[in-house]
Amino acid sequence: MNLLQGKTAIVTGGSRGIGSGIVKAFIEQGANVAFTFYGTAPEEAEAEIQELKDKGVKIKSYQSNAADFEACEVLVNQVLEDFGGIDILVNNAGITKDNLLMRMSEADFDKVIAVNLKSIFNMTKAVQKVFLKQRSGNIINMSSVVGVQGNAGQANYAASKAGILGFTKSIALELGSRNIRCNAIAPGFIETEMTAKLAPEVVQGWRDSIPLKRGGTVEDIANACVFLASDMSSYITGQVLRIDGGMITA
């Protein structure tokens, strides 16, 4: 299927992990993709382009800091110049700086809020003018089950991801009349290169606590993004799609 044929998407934080999976899934579904990277080496982004360049669509990487308001404006203008339009925005860039509150520094709190939450304001604000002009657009924000229920040792991360949920619902209400949709995805325990660094018994403990008895995959999240980005979800906005194997059932 080519569920995203002819559409152009921006994916922030698209050079590794979940972001890379989203880029690949969008390409497979016929989308042109502009993806950003910031904390990773340019070689990683270039390797991703080389892997996907023969799929018959356009793909390009941009080194850009989503936490920088002006940089986001520059990015959107550059993507418009390079691709001729924007139809989908996936706000995926994010970091963790976990610690108990008593040990968490102000800098670590501020950094996580800036990268995880303010970046979504920055990018949505920058792309809004494009979507309003064409009276169509699709925004997908990457939250987390931690933003739904909290987690000890992640007060900064939980606050940022919970903020995304409120932002998503508000933007859906503001822009729905202009045919602009905004939804969020809340992944649960997803097995990536980050979780591969954890002790095997820790990973197994997570798996055992999940009703489906496994961790999620990058593909699980990417497939959900394809659904929300496509016309198959054209009557869905302001929603939070939890991809968590049943971790949260209430």
PLM regions: where:
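Conserved glycine-rich cofactor-binding loop
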Residues: T8, S15-G17
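Conserved glycine-rich Rossmann-like NAD(P)H-binding loop of the short-chain dehydrogenase/reductase
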Residues: Q29-E46
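Substrate-binding pocket helix/loop in short-chain dehydrogenase/reductase
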Residues: L100-L101, D108-I113, T195, W206
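Active-site helix of classical SDR
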Residues: T124, S160, T168
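Alpha-helical segment proximal to the catalytic Tyr-Lys
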Residues: K129, L173-S177, S234
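Residue(s) in the substrate-gating loop at a strand-loop-helix junction
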Residues: S144
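Short, small/polar-rich loop/turn modules that mediate ligand/substrate recognition or access, typified
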Residues: G176, R181, I236-G238, D244
